[in-house]
Amino acid sequence: MLINQFKNVFKKVRGMFISDGFKRLCRQFFWGFYSLLQAFLISCFILFNPLGLKNTSQEQSELVYLDVTASSFDARLDSAVVVLIDEYTIESHNLTYPVDYHSLARILRAINGYNPNSIFIDILQSYPHSNGFDYWANTLKRVGQNQPVFLAQDLDFDKSWRLNDPNNARHKLSQSAILTPVSWRGEPNRYPLTINHNGETYQTVAMSVYEEFCKTSDCQLFKSNEPHDEPMIVRWNNRYSDKQLDFLNVKDRCHSNQRSFIEAFGKHVVSTFQSKEELAELRVQCPPILTLSASEFLEESATDNQALRDVIKDRAVFIGYKLTGSSDLVTSPVHGQLDGVFFHAMAFVNLVSLDEDYWRSQNAIENCPIAKNCDFSRFDLYQALLQTIILGVSIYLKNHQLRDDSEVNAPSTGVFIIFVLFSVIVCAVVLNIQEATGPANWIALTSITLISVSMLIKPMLMRWTQQKLSKLSFGRSQNI
């Protein structure tokens, strides 16, 4: 009796587990897992970047995104001014390169007379190159009594024995100005706020100048205990200072260059089919920050000029060279190539404008559990996860329609619309996350989304075409 009851229960349990519904559920689980596995392997290939595809697409994504959002970047242009020692300055005042120390001191004294907030000199002075070096060092020291004077430094060159030798030029300059590093290892389109060198941490130019700026302003960046070791993604604006037309000979080129999102995006779409000359015309020709020629400060009226006073007072001044053939250049996605001093100035403007909300480039994951060195950040992992989900869903739907060996067995229009809406939500999530982390890899994400949509829309079009042909054939048969 008990044996028969046990057999009956066993048959019921077995029938329940091998029912058609359970089999269908197992098949769906298998195909879902198989689809996600395929998507996961593809995302891992992108994430681990064996061919450099991730870095290339990330870099291009940033260039496009920084350009199309340039109009919406509310940059505090009134916080900085750039002074360029250009060819006009050298030729009009019969100078030579490098400019002699007496002329540099004259420029510095004139700027100091207008009470700037701070001064940065983007000139690496490793050895004395003309007479008057001691006079220049003394001028730096006197001007530094009124406001901080930061001088460019190469940490690899400034060995301890140079800085400790009283007869060495670098020692004399270190006693007269604040040496600040201007070169670092790493990605050239990133601006670190701090540098670790030989076990010591140094602030870069933008961070040092901003710290001085915050002494008279309410800044949140220095109120936290964060190490600020995540480099900045420098944002660029496509507007120019209202007072730019009063200085430099740029009146023919400084016209309104504010582009809408669509216009900026269209520029990158057609850039592949245009020449370098045509691309140059699309770039913003005006400097991103109010820019003066150093010749203004070598004129006889340089010490009592109200126009100069209005644009120098309480601003951070960045001094640098602008010469043809210079290798100290930075590439702006909005302006093209600019002199290196603009990189420091624009990074400072980013800090003034965004404070602690500046766009960060997240560091690679430390103590990576899956590899010796993880060349990706947590934000990269988030992007890879979202890419896996989008691609996995599309592969699952594609596998679902092919199980019966028929491409006409396409997903319904409702399923397709839901998938598209899901993709839009994913993109919105990435857009929200990147407000604090910087531009996402939109090229990779968009490419995967388009591939996923194309896999689904092809069978839908085939089914729609077959239905139309069937109706047409049916209509003809009735007429016959």
Where in the sequence are the language-model features?
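Short hydrophobic alpha-helical membrane-anchoring segments
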Residues: 40-51, 396, 400, 428, ...
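Loop-to-transmembrane alpha-helix initiation sites
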Residues: 435-448
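Flexible inter-domain connectors and hinge/loop segments
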Residues: 2-384, 462-480
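Juxtamembrane interface at the cytosolic side of transmembrane helices
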Residues: 390-436, 460-472
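Selective detector of the "anchor" transmembrane alpha-helix that sits immediately C-terminal
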Residues: 366-403, 445-455
